[in-house]
Protein backbone atom coordinates (compact mmCIF):
# COMPACT_ATOMS: atom_id res chain seq x y z
CA UNK A 1 0.00 0.00 0.00
CA UNK A 2 1.32 3.51 -0.78
CA UNK A 3 2.65 5.52 2.15
CA UNK A 4 0.14 7.83 3.84
CA UNK A 5 2.75 10.44 4.78
CA UNK A 6 5.53 12.29 3.04
CA UNK A 7 8.75 13.49 4.61
CA UNK A 8 9.91 17.06 4.08
CA UNK A 9 13.27 17.95 5.65
CA UNK A 10 12.85 15.17 8.17
CA UNK A 11 9.28 16.14 9.11
CA UNK A 12 6.41 13.76 8.38
CA UNK A 13 3.22 15.27 6.96
CA UNK A 14 0.01 13.34 6.21
CA UNK A 15 -0.32 13.35 2.42
CA UNK A 16 -4.08 13.68 2.36
CA UNK A 17 -5.68 16.54 4.24
CA UNK A 18 -9.21 17.82 4.68
CA UNK A 19 -9.82 21.25 3.16
CA UNK A 20 -12.37 23.61 4.70
CA UNK A 21 -12.77 26.38 2.12
CA UNK A 22 -16.42 27.53 1.94
CA UNK A 23 -17.32 25.35 4.94
CA UNK A 24 -18.60 27.53 7.77
CA UNK A 25 -20.59 27.44 10.98
CA UNK A 26 -21.85 24.13 12.32
CA UNK A 27 -21.00 22.43 9.02
CA UNK A 28 -17.33 23.24 9.58
CA UNK A 29 -17.40 21.88 13.10
CA UNK A 30 -19.18 18.66 12.15
CA UNK A 31 -17.17 18.01 8.99
CA UNK A 32 -13.83 18.44 10.75
CA UNK A 33 -14.93 16.15 13.58
CA UNK A 34 -16.13 13.57 11.07
CA UNK A 35 -12.96 13.79 8.98
CA UNK A 36 -10.79 13.19 12.02
CA UNK A 37 -12.95 10.31 13.20
CA UNK A 38 -12.59 8.75 9.73
CA UNK A 39 -8.82 8.94 10.01
CA UNK A 40 -7.72 12.23 8.48
CA UNK A 41 -4.79 13.76 10.35
CA UNK A 42 -4.25 16.91 8.29
CA UNK A 43 -6.66 19.86 8.45
CA UNK A 44 -6.39 23.00 6.32
CA UNK A 45 -8.08 26.31 7.09
CA UNK A 46 -7.41 30.04 6.67
CA UNK A 47 -8.21 33.37 8.25
CA UNK A 48 -10.18 34.31 5.17
CA UNK A 49 -12.41 31.24 5.47
CA UNK A 50 -14.04 32.63 8.61
CA UNK A 51 -14.26 29.19 10.20
CA UNK A 52 -11.26 28.85 12.51
CA UNK A 53 -13.39 28.85 15.68
CA UNK A 54 -15.54 26.00 14.34
CA UNK A 55 -12.54 24.10 12.98
CA UNK A 56 -11.00 24.24 16.45
CA UNK A 57 -14.24 23.01 17.99
CA UNK A 58 -14.36 20.12 15.54
CA UNK A 59 -10.81 19.14 16.44
CA UNK A 60 -11.66 19.10 20.14
CA UNK A 61 -14.93 17.24 19.55
CA UNK A 62 -13.07 14.49 17.70
CA UNK A 63 -10.93 13.60 20.69
CA UNK A 64 -7.86 13.28 18.47
CA UNK A 65 -4.80 14.46 20.42
CA UNK A 66 -3.37 17.69 19.06
CA UNK A 67 0.08 16.18 18.62
CA UNK A 68 -1.35 13.60 16.19
CA UNK A 69 -2.67 16.28 13.84
CA UNK A 70 -1.10 18.47 11.16
CA UNK A 71 -2.88 21.84 11.25
CA UNK A 72 -2.37 24.49 8.56
CA UNK A 73 -3.79 28.00 8.35
CA UNK A 74 -3.11 31.09 6.28
CA UNK A 75 -2.63 34.83 6.73
CA UNK A 76 -4.52 37.03 4.27
CA UNK A 77 -2.28 39.41 2.25
CA UNK A 78 -3.99 42.44 3.83
CA UNK A 79 -2.14 41.34 6.99
CA UNK A 80 1.26 40.89 5.33
CA UNK A 81 2.96 43.72 7.26
CA UNK A 82 5.10 42.46 10.13
CA UNK A 83 2.90 43.70 12.98
CA UNK A 84 -0.22 42.50 11.21
CA UNK A 85 1.23 39.04 10.60
CA UNK A 86 1.79 38.56 14.32
CA UNK A 87 -1.57 40.04 15.26
CA UNK A 88 -3.37 37.79 12.78
CA UNK A 89 -1.47 34.69 13.89
CA UNK A 90 -2.20 35.30 17.55
CA UNK A 91 -5.89 35.75 16.79
CA UNK A 92 -5.91 32.61 14.67
CA UNK A 93 -4.32 30.56 17.44
CA UNK A 94 -6.90 31.90 19.90
CA UNK A 95 -9.80 31.14 17.57
CA UNK A 96 -8.54 27.64 16.85
CA UNK A 97 -7.86 27.05 20.53
CA UNK A 98 -4.34 25.76 19.96
CA UNK A 99 -0.93 26.89 21.17
CA UNK A 100 0.87 26.30 17.88
CA UNK A 101 0.16 25.83 14.19
CA UNK A 102 2.10 23.22 12.29
CA UNK A 103 2.16 25.45 9.22
CA UNK A 104 1.23 29.08 8.58
CA UNK A 105 1.13 30.34 5.00
CA UNK A 106 0.87 33.71 3.32
CA UNK A 107 -2.40 33.06 1.45
CA UNK A 108 -1.59 35.07 -1.70
CA UNK A 109 1.33 37.29 -2.73
CA UNK A 110 1.07 40.80 -1.28
CA UNK A 111 2.54 43.14 -3.92
CA UNK A 112 2.46 46.22 -1.69
CA UNK A 113 4.56 44.63 1.05
CA UNK A 114 8.19 43.50 0.72
CA UNK A 115 8.22 39.72 0.74
CA UNK A 116 11.22 39.78 3.06
CA UNK A 117 9.19 41.65 5.68
CA UNK A 118 6.38 39.10 5.67
CA UNK A 119 8.71 36.12 5.73
CA UNK A 120 10.79 37.65 8.52
CA UNK A 121 7.61 38.08 10.56
CA UNK A 122 6.62 34.47 9.93
CA UNK A 123 10.14 33.44 10.90
CA UNK A 124 9.81 35.33 14.17
CA UNK A 125 6.62 33.40 14.93
CA UNK A 126 8.52 30.20 14.22
CA UNK A 127 11.33 31.29 16.50
CA UNK A 128 8.83 32.00 19.26
CA UNK A 129 7.28 28.55 18.89
CA UNK A 130 3.88 29.80 17.68
CA UNK A 131 4.24 27.98 14.37
CA UNK A 132 6.26 24.94 13.47
CA UNK A 133 6.87 25.81 9.82
CA UNK A 134 6.17 28.71 7.46
CA UNK A 135 5.19 28.84 3.84
CA UNK A 136 3.39 30.52 0.98
CA UNK A 137 0.37 29.92 -1.21
CA UNK A 138 -0.40 30.73 -4.83
CA UNK A 139 3.25 31.53 -5.58
CA UNK A 140 4.44 30.87 -9.16
CA UNK A 141 7.91 29.40 -9.60
CA UNK A 142 9.92 32.64 -9.74
CA UNK A 143 8.25 34.02 -6.62
CA UNK A 144 8.75 30.71 -4.83
CA UNK A 145 12.46 30.78 -5.59
CA UNK A 146 12.63 34.34 -4.29
CA UNK A 147 10.85 33.31 -1.09
CA UNK A 148 13.04 30.24 -0.61
CA UNK A 149 16.14 32.44 -0.86
CA UNK A 150 14.81 34.60 1.97
CA UNK A 151 13.42 32.04 4.44
CA UNK A 152 13.07 28.29 5.06
CA UNK A 153 9.82 27.97 3.10
CA UNK A 154 8.28 24.60 3.91
CA UNK A 155 5.29 24.55 1.55
CA UNK A 156 3.61 26.25 -1.38
CA UNK A 157 -0.13 25.63 -1.61
CA UNK A 158 -1.41 25.99 -5.18
CA UNK A 159 -4.18 24.80 -7.45
CA UNK A 160 -3.04 21.48 -8.90
CA UNK A 161 -4.95 18.70 -10.58
CA UNK A 162 -4.85 16.52 -13.69
CA UNK A 163 -6.22 19.33 -15.86
CA UNK A 164 -3.55 21.86 -14.83
CA UNK A 165 0.18 21.41 -15.40
CA UNK A 166 2.35 22.76 -12.61
CA UNK A 167 5.73 21.57 -13.85
CA UNK A 168 7.49 24.89 -13.22
CA UNK A 169 6.23 25.16 -9.66
CA UNK A 170 7.02 21.50 -8.99
CA UNK A 171 10.53 22.06 -10.31
CA UNK A 172 11.07 24.95 -7.92
CA UNK A 173 9.66 22.87 -5.07
CA UNK A 174 12.10 20.06 -5.80
CA UNK A 175 15.03 22.49 -5.98
CA UNK A 176 14.31 23.78 -2.49
CA UNK A 177 12.69 20.73 -0.81
CA UNK A 178 9.34 22.51 -0.58
CA UNK A 179 6.08 20.59 -0.23
CA UNK A 180 3.46 21.36 -2.87
CA UNK A 181 -0.03 21.16 -1.38
CA UNK A 182 -2.67 20.78 -4.06
CA UNK A 183 -5.98 22.55 -3.57
CA UNK A 184 -8.99 22.01 -5.87
CA UNK A 185 -7.66 18.53 -6.77
CA UNK A 186 -10.85 17.74 -8.71
CA UNK A 187 -10.90 21.01 -10.71
CA UNK A 188 -14.17 21.93 -8.98
CA UNK A 189 -15.69 18.59 -9.94
CA UNK A 190 -14.84 18.72 -13.64
CA UNK A 191 -12.39 15.83 -13.35
CA UNK A 192 -14.97 13.51 -11.86
CA UNK A 193 -16.71 13.06 -15.23
CA UNK A 194 -13.53 12.47 -17.20
CA UNK A 195 -13.68 9.20 -19.20
CA UNK A 196 -9.98 8.45 -18.70
CA UNK A 197 -10.34 8.61 -14.92
CA UNK A 198 -13.57 6.60 -15.09
CA UNK A 199 -11.88 3.83 -17.09
CA UNK A 200 -8.91 3.62 -14.74
CA UNK A 201 -11.21 3.71 -11.72
CA UNK A 202 -13.26 0.80 -13.06
CA UNK A 203 -10.12 -1.29 -13.50
CA UNK A 204 -9.31 -0.82 -9.80
CA UNK A 205 -12.88 -0.96 -8.46
CA UNK A 206 -12.24 2.61 -7.36
CA UNK A 207 -13.82 5.99 -8.14
CA UNK A 208 -12.65 8.87 -10.36
CA UNK A 209 -12.00 11.02 -7.30
CA UNK A 210 -9.74 8.34 -5.85
CA UNK A 211 -7.82 8.12 -9.13
CA UNK A 212 -7.45 11.91 -9.27
CA UNK A 213 -6.07 11.98 -5.73
CA UNK A 214 -3.85 8.92 -6.15
CA UNK A 215 -2.27 10.53 -9.22
CA UNK A 216 -1.34 13.57 -7.14
CA UNK A 217 -0.21 11.72 -4.04
CA UNK A 218 2.13 9.44 -5.99
CA UNK A 219 4.20 12.48 -6.91
CA UNK A 220 7.24 13.42 -4.85
CA UNK A 221 6.67 16.21 -2.30
CA UNK A 222 2.95 16.51 -3.16
CA UNK A 223 0.07 16.52 -0.68
CA UNK A 224 -3.60 17.30 -1.36
CA UNK A 225 -6.46 18.88 0.57
CA UNK A 226 -9.80 17.99 -1.03
CA UNK A 227 -13.00 19.38 0.41
CA UNK A 228 -15.97 17.03 0.75
CA UNK A 229 -19.54 17.90 1.66
CA UNK A 230 -20.60 14.52 3.05
CA UNK A 231 -19.37 11.68 5.24
CA UNK A 232 -19.45 9.37 2.23
CA UNK A 233 -17.31 11.67 0.11
CA UNK A 234 -14.79 12.18 2.89
CA UNK A 235 -14.48 8.41 3.31
CA UNK A 236 -14.22 7.95 -0.45
CA UNK A 237 -11.39 10.46 -0.72
CA UNK A 238 -9.52 8.83 2.15
CA UNK A 239 -9.67 5.58 0.19
CA UNK A 240 -7.29 7.10 -2.36
CA UNK A 241 -4.45 6.32 0.03
CA UNK A 242 -4.92 2.63 -0.73
CA UNK A 243 -4.88 3.02 -4.52
CA UNK A 244 -1.70 2.53 -6.54
CA UNK A 245 -1.75 3.40 -10.24
CA UNK A 246 0.33 1.60 -12.82
CA UNK A 247 2.96 3.69 -14.57
CA UNK A 248 0.95 3.70 -17.80
CA UNK A 249 -2.17 4.77 -15.89
CA UNK A 250 -0.25 7.54 -14.18
CA UNK A 251 0.96 8.76 -17.57
CA UNK A 252 -2.55 8.65 -19.05
CA UNK A 253 -3.86 10.87 -16.26
CA UNK A 254 -0.87 13.17 -16.57
CA UNK A 255 -1.53 13.65 -20.29
CA UNK A 256 -4.77 15.43 -19.40
CA UNK A 257 -2.76 18.41 -18.09
CA UNK A 258 -2.62 19.82 -21.61
CA UNK A 259 -6.08 21.27 -20.97
CA UNK A 260 -4.48 23.80 -18.62
CA UNK A 261 -7.72 24.53 -16.79
CA UNK A 262 -7.24 26.99 -13.93
CA UNK A 263 -10.29 27.49 -11.72
CA UNK A 264 -8.81 29.95 -9.19
CA UNK A 265 -7.66 33.10 -10.97
CA UNK A 266 -8.86 36.26 -9.18
CA UNK A 267 -7.97 39.71 -10.41
CA UNK A 268 -5.25 40.07 -7.78
CA UNK A 269 -3.52 36.81 -8.76
CA UNK A 270 0.16 36.92 -9.76
CA UNK A 271 1.39 36.20 -13.28
CA UNK A 272 1.19 32.41 -13.44
CA UNK A 273 3.80 30.15 -15.02
At which residue positions do the language-model features occur?
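Conserved acidic residues
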Residues: 41, 99-102, 154
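Beta/alpha (TIM)-barrel catalytic core signal, keyed to glycine-rich beta->alpha loops juxtaposed to Asp/Glu
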Residues: 109-273
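Acidic-and-aromatic substrate-binding clefts and catalytic sites of carbohydrate-active enzymes
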Residues: 24-26, 46-54, 78-83, 111-114, ...
